[in-house]
């Protein structure tokens, strides 16, 4: 009973966290990061204003945009829901899994990470979207979904002991998976850094075309693509290592990871050469964050 209870709470927390990453990405691509210029309130209110007349006199009314304000407010509210979900999960872990270090510590680390990232969200606003703080915010989110995914799969193993009792990965596979996870995190951060630099260059050079903005990045722009193809080759190597795997699910996941990396590279190259909708960038980043969690499984 306790195994299933923790598994459900961990799974819900993981799904909600991925949804939060999506909404956070929507905040980024829509320019809603300062949709609520103060924190934790929004224009001095616990619920965002619906008209300019509701804005306090000490806040510049020209900064108000009802759509951006409610997108940012939705992001914050979802963050609160994720926080409470992880608190419930942690309480279950403390009550029933004090002798299971994998479950207990995954829950405690999740609680720490969601709390730290919530506090960092306030700093993101007060720093006026400082690129370094925004990147750190993303790193903690990736660590959070990784730890949650780990706790979820460990609790699933407890429910299905017969299926997983004789399964162990070789050292070569384990090292390759850890390397793949680390490289994907670095790849996401590189992509975020490139986008941030492009936005900063565009502010100083508003007449630059997309090609000129990319040229201004110099050799930095190639790192993202080179690392992307490195990930592709590493995933091919993992497919080779899993060729004789007796557990079909593991083999299918590795093939799925390979397919997602291939698609992400294709989508990334399209974004370089064509003017695709901003939502394309959102799904590009979100898809990469899913890879981080799937590798843990």
Residue ranges and their predicted role:
Residues 29-72, 200-213:
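Extracytosolic (periplasmic/ER-lumenal) interhelical loops and adjacent juxtamembrane/interface segments
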Residues 6-40, 182-193:
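N-terminal signal-anchor transmembrane alpha helix
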Residues 26-36, 115-138, 195-206, 265-289:
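Interfacial helix-loop-helix junctions of multi-pass membrane proteins
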Residues 56-84, 219-225:
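Individual transmembrane alpha-helix segments
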Residues 12, 16-23, 105-124, 179-187, ...:
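Small-polar-interrupted transmembrane alpha-helices in polytopic inner-membrane proteins
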Residues 92-108, 171, 239-257:
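Membrane-interface helix-loop-helix junctions at transmembrane boundaries of multi-pass membrane enzymes
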């Amino acid at each position: 009973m306790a195994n299933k209870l923790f598994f459900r709470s961990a799974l819900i927390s993981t799904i909600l966290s991925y949804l939060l990453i999506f909404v956070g990405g929507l905040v980024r691509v829509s320019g809603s990061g300062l949709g609520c210029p103060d924190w934790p309130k929004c224009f001095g209110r616990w619920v965002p204003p619906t008209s300019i007349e509701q804005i306090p006199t000490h806040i510049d009314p020209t900064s108000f945009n009802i759509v951006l304000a409610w997108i940012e407010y939705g992001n914050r509210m979802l963050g609160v829901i994720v926080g409470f979900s992880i608190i419930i999960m942690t309480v279950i872990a403390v009550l029933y899994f004090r002798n299971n270090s994998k479950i207990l510590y995954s829950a405690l680390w999740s609680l720490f990470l969601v709390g730290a990232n919530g506090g960092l969200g306030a700093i993101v606003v007060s720093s006026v979207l400082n690129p370094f703080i925004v990147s750190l915010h993303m790193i903690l989110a990736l660590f959070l979904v990784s730890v949650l995914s780990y706790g979820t799969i460990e609790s699933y193993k407890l429910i299905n002991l017969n299926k997983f009792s004789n399964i162990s990965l070789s050292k070569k596979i384990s090292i390759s998976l850890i390397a793949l996870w680390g490289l994907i995190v670095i790849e996401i951060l590189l992509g975020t850094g490139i986008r941030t630099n492009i936005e900063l260059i565009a502010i100083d050079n508003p007449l630059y075309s997309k090609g000129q903005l990319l040229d201004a990045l110099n050799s930095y722009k190639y790192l993202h693509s080179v690392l992307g193809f490195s990930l592709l080759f590493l995933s091919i190597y993992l497919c080779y290592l899993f060729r004789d795997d007796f557990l079909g699910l593991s083999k299918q996941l590795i093939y799925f990871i390979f397919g997602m990396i291939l698609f992400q590279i294709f989508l990334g190259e399209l974004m370089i050469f064509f003017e695709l909708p901003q939502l394309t960038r959102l799904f590009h980043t979100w898809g990469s964050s899913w890879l981080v969690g799937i590798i843990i499984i």
